[in-house]
A protein has these predicted regions:
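Helix-loop-helix "hairpin" substructures at the membrane interface of multi-pass membrane proteins
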Residues: 100-108, 115, 119, 173-250
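Transmembrane alpha-helical segments in multi-pass inner-membrane proteins
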Residues: 236, 246-312
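Cytosolic-side transmembrane-helix boundaries in multi-pass membrane proteins
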Residues: 1-23, 148, 216-223, 293-316
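Transmembrane helix-bundle core of multi-pass membrane transporters
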Residues: 126, 130-197, 224-227, 246-255
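Hydrophobic core segments of alpha-helical transmembrane domains in multi-pass membrane transport
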Residues: 14-27, 55-56, 80, 109-112, ...
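Loop-to-transmembrane alpha-helix initiation sites
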Residues: 44-47, 130, 176-184, 225, ...
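Single transmembrane alpha-helix segments in multi-pass membrane proteins
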Residues: 20, 24-28, 32-89, 121-127, ...
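Alpha-helical transmembrane segments within multi-pass membrane transporters and channels
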Residues: 87-138, 285
Length: 316
C-alpha cells in the first residue's frame, strides 16, 4: 500500500503543486483567475514547451542538450531578417524580394536541422558526451548568430519591422485560440505519438534505460542518436521563429539560458537525468509550472530580486 502511495505521489505530485500554486496566487490576487491571464500563460508557455520537448530527447538517453537556447536565438534572428516588411526603412536585406511565408520558415527549420545533425554526428560517431558536444555547438551557434547579426547594413541593431503575416503567426489566432498555442499543441501530439507509438520512440527509451541491452537487441543506437538531435534542432528552430513572431523582432541575445529552463522543466516533470524515464505530459506540466511561477510572481508585484531567489530555488 505504501509503495502504491509513493508511486502515485511521484507520478502526480507536480500536478498538485501546479494546482496549489494557482490557488495561492489567486488568493493573493483573485483577478489572476481570468481567461486573459490563462491565455497569456499558454502563449508564454508555447515556445518553451516546443524547446523543452526537443531538450527532453537528449535527457532520455542520459545526456543534456546545451545548444537549445543559442539555436533558438539564431533561428529568431534568421527568420526575422528574412521576413521584414518590404516598406520598412532599416531592412536587413534591402533588396530581398518578398518571399512566401513558408520559404523563410523552411530555411530556418533546415538550419536548425543541420545543427541538430551536427550534434548527433559528433555524439554518435565519436562517442562524445552530449553535454560536451552540444556545449561546443552552443558556442558555434552563438558565434554564427552574432556574425550574421552584425552584417551591414544591420550592424547589430535589433531586427524589427516584421511582415504582418509573420506577426499574425505570433500574435493572431483562430476562434480565440492563439496560433502559437495551436502549433505547440500539434507538435506536442506529434511528439507523443513518436515517443509512445513508434519503434523509434520506444527504442530511445531502451537506449536510455540500458544502452548495451538495446545494442544486443538489434537497435541501431548511432542512427537513433543522430536523428533525435536532428528532431531537437528542428524544434528549436521552430520555437525561435515563433519567438520572433510573438515579440515582433529579434536580437542575437534571444534564447539566452533557455536550455537550462528547458532541462529544469523536464526534470521537474519527471524526466530522469540518467535516462530512460519521462513522459510528454510531464514536459508540458513542468513548463507550465515554471511559467505560472514567473508570471504569477510578477502579477502579484513581488520584488524582482526576491523573484530571482525564488526562481533559483525552484530549480534546486
Amino acid at each position: 500500500m505504501n509503495n502504491k502511495i509513493k508511486t502515485y505521489l511521484s507520478q502526480y505530485a507536480i500536478y498538485f503543486v501546479l494546482l496549489l500554486l494557482i490557488i495561492v496566487i489567486a488568493i493573493k490576487d483573485p483577478s489572476f483567475i481570468s481567461v486573459r491571464v490563462f491565455k497569456d500563460i499558454l502563449v508564454q508557455s508555447s515556445t518553451r514547451i516546443i524547446i523543452a520537448l526537443g531538450a527532453s530527447l537528449a535527457i532520455l538517453i542520459g545526456g543534456a542538450d546545451l545548444s537549445a537556447g543559442r539555436l533558438v536565438g539564431l533561428a529568431a534572428v534568421l527568420s526575422a531578417s528574412l521576413l521584414q516588411d518590404p516598406n520598412y526603412s532599416a531592412r536587413f536585406f534591402p533588396h530581398l524580394p518578398q518571399l512566401p511565408l513558408l520559404v523563410p520558415l523552411l530555411i530556418t527549420a533546415i538550419v536548425g536541422l543541420l545543427f541538430g545533425l551536427l550534434n548527433g554526428f559528433v555524439v554518435s560517431r565519436f562517442n562524445v558526451p552530449p553535454f560536451i558536444a552540444t556545449l561546443g555547438t552552443m558556442v558555434i551557434a552563438y558565434g554564427a548568430d552574432n556574425i550574421y547579426f552584425s552584417l551591414p547594413p544591420n550592424n547589430s541593431q535589433p531586427i524589427a519591422g516584421l511582415r504582418k503575416d509573420f506577426l499574425e503567426l505570433g500574435t493572431g489566432g483562430f476562434l480565440g485560440i492563439p496560433y502559437v498555442v495551436i502549433i505547440a499543441v500539434v507538435i506536442t501530439i506529434i511528439m507523443w505519438i513518436i515517443m509512445n507509438k513508434t519503434s523509434f520512440g520506444k527504442n530511445l527509451y531502451a537506449i536510455g534505460g540500458n544502452r548495451e541491452a538495446a545494442v544486443v537487441s538489434g537497435v541501431d543506437v548511432k542512427k537513433h542518436i543522430l536523428w533525435l538531435f536532428a528532431i531537437a534542432g528542428t524544434l528549436y528552430a521552430i520555437a525561435g521563429a515563433l519567438e520572433a513572431a510573438r515579440t515582433g523582432g529579434a536580437t542575437s541575445e534571444y534564447g539566452t539560458m533557455y536550455e537550462l529552463d528547458a532541462i529544469a522543466a523536464c526534470v521537474v516533470g519527471g524526466w530522469s537525468v540518467s535516462g530512460g524515464v519521462g513522459t510528454v505530459p510531464g514536459v508540458i506540466v513542468g513548463v507550465l509550472l515554471f511559467t505560472v511561477i514567473n508570471y504569477g510572481l510578477t502579477f502579484i508585484g513581488m520584488n524582482p530580486y526576491w523573484q530571482l531567489i525564488i526562481k533559483g530555488g525552484e530549480r534546486v
